[in-house]
């Protein structure tokens, strides 16, 4: 919401400084986004052209002498419309042109010095929709004075208004809030004094209302849609609103001043009656912004007896019946509709306008008559015309809300002592009607423009807001001497950061179509009201979002990445309070940056296997406590992935992504990933192994077995370990080979076995017996054949 300081002062009687007003706005919850004092526009002044001569060396250039009320400047100009006696706008040397940010300097054009520039509307950033001017701006004699600043240098304040404070989307509402907080007094606007002297006929246009709402209208004939007054143009320009025509600018002014959207129709284009109804079927609509929209059942339209659509109600009017400069007869509409209906209608066509933005945040339903009267009065004043009587149709009744309010609740909730009289004044200042204020329980009726005051504690908040949050004394929380252990998530973050990964935080939403490619087509949680079409599902896996991050990083030229996220996943069985946390990680590209040691390589399954077991290790789960099973997940590579089970419960997986998924995200290199389901892992007590001093020498023996390619290597290792747990200290694989010399379908698996006794040195026979047990177990369990060479 943007407005000027002088605009605010139209409704607020105060001597407060700009700085104080800005500070107070923030104090009462109206966040000040910016304040523009327009110092950069002070160097654009109104001048009179007093002499024009052709340039001696350029046919299209003219040498002009312009007067700013103090001195004369020589300016070289190429505009065809420059002439003696005209008023225009001079940009002094050092000025910055609004359109293109060009800095004006002293220039020599074909040998002639030029001290400034005469500006066009386009260069000043004020091009009007119907403007055909191609030369410099020509100002009317009686509106602008030579020497004055062309732009209003009135400070412009911009506020971020929260959705619940629609009443502050008008300057009058902001002034009302400041006055309630003690900044001056609110100037009254007596709408009842506005009368129509020439009202002597009934509107030829009738209204029919088939939806919930209230519609009022006035037919005005014989208007002259002239140029907008200077002061009104300046107000609109300060708010970033372009001047269209006097009639349109007036209703925009009413909307910005009083948060009261209105709409104007060319009455000659309406066939007899306006019917406000919802659409039965899809239909195309040509809007006044020169765009075409496909309307659906969510949209409310205004149609006439010829079935022509004249507006999407509360959103935008039609190209057919928009008000132009040659329009003579108009129908002025002022309406209130259900905010939900307006929001759905606006969202259907993906168009938000100043009108719909306000209507969907609730506008005052009791201000229709006054808003219509004020707009009509201004149109008659500046454009002339003869108004009809007001035509009105109502399909909604605004009922006052009665709130039982205890003044003691301010102290109980806000921990401040405010007198009953102060509380009474605060509530009255914001427009509330307070009854029974001599009793313990007051009956408070919120004003019609404050739809956010629905409960008694809302009134407490209002009192505290106006009293000042800064006056509430701090009550520091006592610091406890108890030291709490680090949170598990923080420990896991530290572990993965030490693995060279970076943490990311992504949305809890994901794309349904992508999720289906991962096999998530049941037990999923769809979003009825997604923020966009690509985020229409609560994520069943964090992996989907991480892959999107990788894809976007690749698009920006980042070809190596290792990222992780600790977050929640969701399914249809999730209930409020469920903490389905997972740790998910993705590696892509090379494991290290390029270096002269040539230690960089492409990441593989063993990188994420290390990450996975580092997480488990932090949760007191050792490698020997879990079972690895070849993964059956469709989005993982069938030969380079594993599911991990703990106590027969699936607690995660790791592996390389299936090439089809990599292609889906348009990623150029293989990706490895892991995901640990933290919510499935029970708390495992930390068990410390007793230290055993290794006093006796170990012995290593290597074995090479021929086994089928279908053998689970992990199971082979486990079988070898269990043959003699007292003597076998470790079993590891140091080579897997297939190719020349190995039968088809077979593998050569080489094991390194470490033998050690805790109480004596092993002799040859003990080592031989233990080796024979390994050979026998693998032969029986896997049909393994010991290779002789």
Swiss-Prot record:
The yes or no answer to whether the keyword RNA-binding is present is yes
Q: Where is the tRNA-binding domain?
A: 38-151
The answer to keyword Iron applying to this record is: no
Q: Which domain of life is it from?
A: Bacteria
| Enzyme Commission number | 6.1.1.20
* GO cellular component terms, semicolon-separated: phenylalanine-tRNA ligase complex
Cofactor(s) listed: Mg(2+)
Q: Which UniProt keywords apply?
A: Aminoacyl-tRNA synthetase, ATP-binding, Cytoplasm, Ligase, Magnesium, Metal-binding, Nucleotide-binding, Protein biosynthesis, RNA-binding, tRNA-binding
Q: What catalytic activity is recorded? A: tRNA(Phe) + L-phenylalanine + ATP = L-phenylalanyl-tRNA(Phe) + AMP + diphosphate + H(+)
Every copy of the FDX-ACB domain together lies at 694-787
Q: Which GO terms describe its molecular function?
A: ATP binding; magnesium ion binding; phenylalanine-tRNA ligase activity; tRNA binding
Q: Which PROSITE patterns match?
A: B5, FDX_ACB, TRBD
> Which residues are connected by disulfide bridges in this protein?
none
Its BP terms in the Gene Ontology are: phenylalanyl-tRNA aminoacylation
Q: Where in the cell is it found?
A: Cytoplasm
**Domain called B5: residue spans:** 398-474
Top EC class for this record: ligase
How would you summarize the oligomeric state and partners of this protein? Tetramer of two alpha and two beta subunits.
Concerning its family, UniProt says: Belongs to the phenylalanyl-tRNA synthetase beta subunit family. Type 1 subfamily.
* NCBIfam families noted in UniProt: pheT_bact (TIGR00472), YtpR (NF045760)
PANTHER family, per database record? PHENYLALANINE--TRNA LIGASE BETA SUBUNIT, PHENYLALANYL-TRNA SYNTHETASE BETA CHAIN AND LEUCINE-RICH REPEAT-CONTAINING PROTEIN 47
HAMAP family this protein is in? Phe_tRNA_synth_beta1
The molecule here is called Phenylalanine--tRNA ligase beta subunit
């Amino acid at each position: 919401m943007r407005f000027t300081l002088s605009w605010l002062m139209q409704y607020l009687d105060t001597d407060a400084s700009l700085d104080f007003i800005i500070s107070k706005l923030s104090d009462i919850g109206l966040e000040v986004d910016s304040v523009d004092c327009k110092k950069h526009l002070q160097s654009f002044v109104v001048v009179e052209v007093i002499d024009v001569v052709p340039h001696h060396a350029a046919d299209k250039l003219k040498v002009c002498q312009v007067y700013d009320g103090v001195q004369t400047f020589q300016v070289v100009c190429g505009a065809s419309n420059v002439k003696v006696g005209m008023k225009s706008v001079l940009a002094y040397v050092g000025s910055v042109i609004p359109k293109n940010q060009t800095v004006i300097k002293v220039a020599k054009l074909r040998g002639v010095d030029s001290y400034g520039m005469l500006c066009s509307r386009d260069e000043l950033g004020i091009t009007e929709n119907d403007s055909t001017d191609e030369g410099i701006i020509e100002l009317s004699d009686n509106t602008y004075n030579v020497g004055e600043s062309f732009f209003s240098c009135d400070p412009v304040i911009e506020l971020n208004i929260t959705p619940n404070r629609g009443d502050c989307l008008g300057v009058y509402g902001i002034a009302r809030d400041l006055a309630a907080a003690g900044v001056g007094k609110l100037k009254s606007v007596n709408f009842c004094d506005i009368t129509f002297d020439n009202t002597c006929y009934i509107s030829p246009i009738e209204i029919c209302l088939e939806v919930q709402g209230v519609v009022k209208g006035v037919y005005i004939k014989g208007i002259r849609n002239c140029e907008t007054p200077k002061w009104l143009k300046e107000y609109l320009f300060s708010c970033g609103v372009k001047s269209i025509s006097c009639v349109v600018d007036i209703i925009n002014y009413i909307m910005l001043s009083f948060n009261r959207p209105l709409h104007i129709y060319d009455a000659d284009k309406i066939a007899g009656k306006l019917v406000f109804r919802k659409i039965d079927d899809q239909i195309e609509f040509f809007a006044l912004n020169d765009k075409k929209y496909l309307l659906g059942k969510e949209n409310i339209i205004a149609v006439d007896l010829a079935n022509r659509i004249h507006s999407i109600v509360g959103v935008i009017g039609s190209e057919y019946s928009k008000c132009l400069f040659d329009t003579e007869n108009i129908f002025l509409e002022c309406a209130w509709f259900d905010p939900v209906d307006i929001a759905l209608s606006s969202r259907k066509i993906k168009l938000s306008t100043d009108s719909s933005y306000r209507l969907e945040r609730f506008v005052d339903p009791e201000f229709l008559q006054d808003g219509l009267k004020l707009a009509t009065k201004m149109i008659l004043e500046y454009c002339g015309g003869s108004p009809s009587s007001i035509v009105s149709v109502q399909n909604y009744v605004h009922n006052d809300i009665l709130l039982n309010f205890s003044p003691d609740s301010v102290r109980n909730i806000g921990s401040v002592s405010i007198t009953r009289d102060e509380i009474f004044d605060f509530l009255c200042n914001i427009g509330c009607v307070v009854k029974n204020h001599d009793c313990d329980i007051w009956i408070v009726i919120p004003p019609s423009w404050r739809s956010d005051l629905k409960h008694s504690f809302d009134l407490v908040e209002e009192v505290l807001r106006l009293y000042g949050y800064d006056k509430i004394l701090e009550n520091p929380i006592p610091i406890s001497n108890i030291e709490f252990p680090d949170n598990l998530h923080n420990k896991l973050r530290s572990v993965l950061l030490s693995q060279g990964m970076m943490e990311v935080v992504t949305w809890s939403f994901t794309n349904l179509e992508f999720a289906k490619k991962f096999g998530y087509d049941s037990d999923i949680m769809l979003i009825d009201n997604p923020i966009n079409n690509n985020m229409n599902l609560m994520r069943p896996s964090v992996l989907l979002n991480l892959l999107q991050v990788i894809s976007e990083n690749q698009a920006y030229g980042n070809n190596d990445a290792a990222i992780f996220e600790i977050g929640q996943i969701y399914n249809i069985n999730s209930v409020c309070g469920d903490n389905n946390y997972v740790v998910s990680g993705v590696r892509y590209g090379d494991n290290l940056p390029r270096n002269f040691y040539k230690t960089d390589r492409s990441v593989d399954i063993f990188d994420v296997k290390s990450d996975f077991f580092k997480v488990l290790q932090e949760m007191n789960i050792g490698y020997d406590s879990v079972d690895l099973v070849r993964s059956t997940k469709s989005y993982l590579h069938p030969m380079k992935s594993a599911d991990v089970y703990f106590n027969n419960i699936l607690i995660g997986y790791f592996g390389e992504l299936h090439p089809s998924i990599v292609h889906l995200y348009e990623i150029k290199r293989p990706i490895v990933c892991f995901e640990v389901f933290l919510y499935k892992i029970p708390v495992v007590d930390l068990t410390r192994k007793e230290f055993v001093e290794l006093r006796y020498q170990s012995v290593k023996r290597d074995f090479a077995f021929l086994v089928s390619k279908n053998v689970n290597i992990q199971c082979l290792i486990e079988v070898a370990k269990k043959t003699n747990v007292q003597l076998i200290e470790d079993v590891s694989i140091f080579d897997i080979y297939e190719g020349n010399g190995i039968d088809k379908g077979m593998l050569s698996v080489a094991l390194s076995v470490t033998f050690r006794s805790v109480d004596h040195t092993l002799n040859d026979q003990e080592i031989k017996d233990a080796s024979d047990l390994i050979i026998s177990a693998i032969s029986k369990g896997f049909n393994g054949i010991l290779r002789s060479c």
